[in-house]
């Protein structure tokens, strides 16, 4: 049963913020501009691997994860148009998916709520039950795969398939499982004409899986013959890169909003704008002096 956070209206947002006494990533005066902006229905924003701890002062690998998320939110709020949706691709919590982690995460994304609806995926540092209890007020539950957070949503130029690769909390590899793969195959059969983009936390890994998606081969057995599948978007590695599978499916490895494992690699967020025959993708690095910051790449869809 996936969770989806609908966009808050101005009245809902201001009322909720006042009642909660929430600390916001933006000054109150900034919100007037947000509510007045137009929406680009073809643009989507991706955050990944936020790793928010209960203690907002927590630091790991010299990075304050809460501060990094706040910086991403501020830049998103300053963007000239509002995206169609914001997708946060797993590892929302720091290590063990504790209730306090999600409480701090919820505060961190509060300023996103009036900007766009949000889809939240899970990674290996999340804990499903704690996560599901963290947003009781306004989550929309959709039936899909029992005990998995999988969903399909449609936009003008693509259908989006959101998967749940959380296997065991704080164990590095992930797994979709036969039930979820079967569900995905059936949903792809039901959505044959529009381009399909699949989003999952764990990275596909070849030929031997040690830290990524344990059923990578089984996933590609589903994706490759469904020619409407054009891209697989994932996180987990904390290493921004774009490659292409032999089948023609684009592999997009999101940067973390938090920390990187390799020196010199960017952290930040990604803007995706869909075209009829592909996508434009831009890295927004938190380090504006990073050589890849602001780079825009054009991806063309495979045939079929």
Where are the model-predicted features located?
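N-terminal secretory signal peptides
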Residues: 1-12
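N-terminal active-site segment of His-dependent metallophosphoesterases
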Residues: 8, 16, 31-103
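Catalytic metal-binding/acid-base residues of hydrolase active sites
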Residues: 19, 51, 92-93, 125-127, ...
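Extended active-site neighborhood of metal-dependent phosphoesterases/phosphodiesterases
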Residues: 35-36, 98-186, 190-191, 195, ...
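Active-site neighborhood of phospho(di)ester-bond hydrolases with catalytic His/Asp-centered motifs
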Residues: 47-48, 86-90, 118-123, 163, ...
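Surface-exposed cleft-lining segments at the edges of enzyme active sites
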Residues: 92-93, 166-175, 204-208
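Short acidic, glycine-rich surface-loop motifs adjacent to enzyme active sites
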Residues: 191-207
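Acidic, His/Gly-rich catalytic cores of divalent-metal-dependent hydrolytic chemistry
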Residues: 278-304
